[in-house]
Every structure is written in C-alpha cells, then in structure tokens.
Amino acid sequence: MSALTPHVYWAQRHGEIYLRVEISDAQDLSIGVEENILQFRGQGHGAKGENEYEFSLEFLKPVKPEVKHKSTQRQVNITVRKQEEVWWNRLTKQEKKPLFLAPDFDRWLDESDAEMELREKEEKINKVSFESRVRKDPFLGLKKGFLFMYNLVQFLGYSWIFVNMTVRLFILGQDSFYDTFHTIADVMYFCQMLAIMEVINPAVGLVKTGVMPAFIQVMGRNFILFVIFGSLEDMQNKPVVFFVFYLWSTIEIFRYPFYMLACIDTEWKLLTWLRYTIWMPLYPLGVLAEAVAVIQSIPIFDETKLLSIPLPKATGLSLSFSYILQLYLVVMFLGLFINFRHLFKQRTRRFRTKKRKAN
C-alpha cells in the first residue's frame, strides 16, 4: 500500500521557509532534514481520515539541519531556516510541484512585500535601540493626558450630535432634515473649531502624523461648515445639511475612541476594525454629500454676489465666487481618489501586520 500524503501549504521569507501540514491531533511525529531533504512522518487525522501520513521535500537550495515544529489541534507548523537569506523562485529542486503542495496564502508575500517587511523589522529594531538610548520624555504623561482629554471631548461632542440627530429622525422623520442646522450647528461649530488642534498637534510634535492630511480634512470640513452653510441662510434649511452632519458624526464616533485608547496603550479589536473599515462606505458618501452642498450653493452665490471679487470699475463686472466653487469640486474629487488610496493602503498595512503577529 502506497504511503498517504497530507496537504502541505508553504510560504517563505528571505531567511525562512514555513510549512503548514494539514493533520489534526498529530502524534508520533518524526520531522528532520538530511542532505537537504525534509522528511515528515506522523499519525493523525488528515485528508484520508485517521492514518499515518508522510512526505519528503528536496529543497531548491541548502537549508540548515535544525527544524522547528509546533503541533496544534488543527495542523503542524514547520519552520526551516535557509543557509543564505535569499529569495527562492520555487520551493523544491524538481521543477514540477508535488501534487500535495500548495501556496499558503494566509502567510504569502511576494518578494517586494517581503523586502518591505524586512525593512519594517529593521526600522523597529533601530527605533527600539534609539529609544533605549534616549532619555524618556518627562512630559510624556502630560502629553498623553492632554491628547486623551482632547479626543474624549471630541467623542462626546460628536456622540451628542449623532444621538440627537438619530432620535430626531425617528421622532420627526423627514421633517428633521430641514432644521438640522439650527439644532446642531452650535455643537458642530465647537467641534470643528476644536478640530484645528489636529493640525497643531502634529505641527508641534505631539503626534507622529502628517500635518498636511490633517490640514486638508479640517479645512475642507470648515469650508463646508462656515462658508457653504454658515454664510448662506438659504442653505441652512436644505436636507443636505442633515446628511453631511450625520456622515461626519458617524465617522468620528469610531475614530476618536480609537485614539483615546491609543493614548493609554490599549486596543479594542472590534473598534480597531471599525476604525479602519467603516470609512470605506462613509468617506465617499461624505464627499458626495459635501459636493451636493457645494453644487446647491453655486446659484445662491451667483444670485447674491456674496464673496464675489470685484473687477476694475471700467468693466462693471465681478468675478463670481461660484467659479472658485467649481474649481473646488474638481479638487474635492481628486482628493477623494488620493485619500481613498492612502487610507486603503493604511488599512491593508495595519491588518497585514496584525495577521503576521497572529501567525
């Protein structure tokens, strides 16, 4: 009777080979490397039920004889170190891949991603080494306390907005759309004025984020709030105000508590997932709502000549502010594409790192 072979999944880094053998409740394991050939034998429950399984793999290039393995209820994980830290084009010396062997997509990285992972590890080691040599900031506790309180105040403010608007929507229905500004504006003004701190904090080194992304977001929102809604009474009774405010507050009631917990070195996995996921539908919807507000304001600015720039008296004309708004619309959707791509990469990097740690 021919020997039974289990399903084996593999992945690599520059210095290591990872094998995942699909045998549950494995016993009597015999795993070793001789003359660059990995020999595996073990009893357990695999693709052919409860049996003894075995396989051998002749590696493409030399590996170290020491083999690390860990058996769990579901599988056997094997780690083999390469003699040289180089990237392999394939796992085995023979070009034709064994039928039982397949890529482990849970751990799979292409060469460029693996190089990026190496750089991240080196940067982390260098950072830890540097921080161990540098005297700790005596004001670190004060800074964290300030940031915690800032995020707490913003969370409470946006939570009040979100709850107030939700309750009014259930009680009044669509009628709540038309007086949102007069009911919510004071708290929204407060939160958005306070949000200027999100530009100041990175500028003075309180947080390690870019100044420009924060500036674009804060100034973009304040432009909609103070110029489009605040300066035009005709805009304040439009339903679009409800949708803009509701989308803003929905995003922030997840973002600010995430930052609050980060200030005290705490993580709530569900909140982290929401922080890096909920923006995917809400951010484009928010930009769309802001664009609708800008479009609806253009004829009002044309009619009232508000904020128009007067030209020389000889012409008797003025440059309408609506031209600036039309240009702003183009910039807004360009910013949507750039920011969406940036946020998606940030999300991918965040969860890929967490997945590696879990493995």
UniProtKB/Swiss-Prot annotation:
Pfam families named in the record: PTPLA
Gene3D superfamilies for this protein: 2.60.40.790
EC main group: lyase
Domain of life of the source: Eukaryota
Chief location of this protein within or outside the cell: endoplasmic reticulum
Any single biological process term in GO: fatty acid elongation
UniProtKB keywords: Coiled coil, Endoplasmic reticulum, Fatty acid biosynthesis, Fatty acid metabolism, Lipid biosynthesis, Lipid metabolism, Lyase, Membrane, Transmembrane, Transmembrane helix
Domain annotation CS: ranges: 3-92
GO MF annotation list: 3-hydroxyacyl-CoA dehydratase activity; very-long-chain (3R)-3-hydroxyacyl-CoA dehydratase activity
Stored InterPro entries: CS_dom, HSP20-like_chaperone, Tyr_Pase-like_PTPLA
Matches recorded under CDD domains: p23_hB-ind1_like
Subcellular location(s) per record: Endoplasmic reticulum membrane
Cytoplasmic topological intervals: 1-144, 208-209, 261-277, 339-359
Catalytic center residues: Y283, E290
Membrane topology classification: Multi-pass membrane protein
Catalyzed chemical reaction(s): a very-long-chain (3R)-3-hydroxyacyl-CoA = a very-long-chain (2E)-enoyl-CoA + H2O; (3R)-hydroxyhexadecanoyl-CoA = (2E)-hexadecenoyl-CoA + H2O
Disulfide bond sites: none
Transmembrane domains' residue ranges: 145-165, 187-207, 210-230, 240-260, 278-298, 318-338
Pathway(s) served: Lipid metabolism; fatty acid biosynthesis
Lumenal side: 166-186, 231-239, 299-317
Alphabetical list of SUPFAM superfamilies matching this protein: HSP20-like chaperones
Coiled-coil portions: 109-133
Task of the protein: Catalyzes the third of the four reactions of the long-chain fatty acids elongation cycle. This endoplasmic reticulum-bound enzymatic process, allows the addition of two carbons to the chain of long- and very long-chain fatty acids/VLCFAs per cycle. This enzyme catalyzes the dehydration of the 3-hydroxyacyl-CoA intermediate into trans-2,3-enoyl-CoA, within each cycle of fatty acid elongation. Thereby, it participates in the production of VLCFAs of different chain lengths that are involved in multiple biological processes as precursors of membrane lipids and lipid mediators.
Similarity-based family: Belongs to the very long-chain fatty acids dehydratase HACD family.
Name by which UniProt lists this protein: Very-long-chain (3R)-3-hydroxyacyl-CoA dehydratase
Organismal lineage: Eukaryota, Metazoa, Chordata, Craniata, Vertebrata
Gene for this chain: hacd3
